Amino acid sequence: MTERPKDIPEDKLVLYVVKATPTSTANTVKPLIVMNELSIDHEIYVVPSPTRDEWFHQINPHKMVPAIESAETRDGKRLNIWESTSCLTYLTDAYDHEGLWKGSDLWERTQVNNWLTLHTAALGATGKYWLYFSAIHPEKIPAVIEKLANNIKVQYDILERRLSEKGQKYIALPDRPTIADVANLPFVTEELALKAGLRLGDWPNLQAWSEKMLARPSVQKALSQKFRPSVMIR
């Protein structure tokens, strides 16, 4: 499809997803959690084929979800936000006026950005490719799958040490969750760990954190279905 569908709202924020639910990908659920936490009015639009629908390439040149289209315009063009980390930072910059989720001062924002950037470069990338090679790639390559699973273990070790620090209840800030926690959550679940041949209980602080995050109403609402990492990636 080359033309932009006429049923896409022009007057509100739009979150673009694939398949039939907002939780089609591990990365798509992240901005949805923040939208729920901040009570952001939004529309969810299911893109039939992000790689083939040419109109969507104007929103995200990488041809992937999640992507967000803001109602804000400049010179007649709407503001496009793509890649999950960019979506998280945009949503908190635009709607988190008290800095609860992005950090309220330079110290807190730096902590959040440190852990958010680490996730983007490490566990996020590793988890994504592990899911791809273990569940989607037509040819199973044991050495690659094992290497990626071991890398997940390394990242779990880092998060466990962080959560073992005195008073550290969450990843970036000690007293409350932030977008750094939201970013990591889809890749730190009992189900994903088991699929990687790991036991999340071997990282007790990380397991407790995961269970606490998964119990949040915003997360429950965003998931809206059984958490299945193997089908949450394209």
Swiss-Prot record:
Named in its record, the pathway it takes part in is: Mycotoxin biosynthesis
Gene Ontology MF, one: glutathione transferase activity
Tell what triggers its expression: Expression is co-regulated with the other genes from the sirodesmin cluster and corresponds with sirodesmin production.
Q: Which key words are in the record?
A: Transferase, Virulence
Highest taxon in the source lineage? Eukaryota
Cystine pairs annotated here are: none
* Biological role stated in the UniProt entry: Glutathione S-transferase; part of the gene cluster that mediates the biosynthesis of sirodesmin PL, an epipolythiodioxopiperazine (ETP) characterized by a disulfide bridged cyclic dipeptide and that acts as a phytotoxin which is involved in the blackleg didease of canola. SirD catalyzes the O-prenylation of L-tyrosine (L-Tyr) in the presence of dimethylallyl diphosphate (DMAPP) to yield 4-O-dimethylallyl-L-Tyr, and therefore represents probably the first pathway-specific enzyme in the biosynthesis of sirodesmin PL.
The similarity comment for this entry is: Belongs to the GST superfamily.
Fetch the InterPro entries from UniProt: Glutathione-S-Trfase_C-like (IPR010987), Glutathione-S-Trfase_C_sf (IPR036282), Glutathione_S-Trfase (IPR040079), Glutathione_S-Trfase_N (IPR004045), GST_C (IPR004046), Thioredoxin-like_sf (IPR036249)
Reaction(s) this enzyme catalyzes, per UniProt: RX + glutathione = an S-substituted glutathione + a halide anion + H(+)
Where is each GST N-terminal domain found? Answer: 15-99
Identify the residues that the record assigns to the GST C-terminal domain, covering every copy.
105-230
Name of this protein: Glutathione S-transferase sirG
**Broadest EC class assigned to this enzyme:** transferase
Listed EC numbers:
2.5.1.18
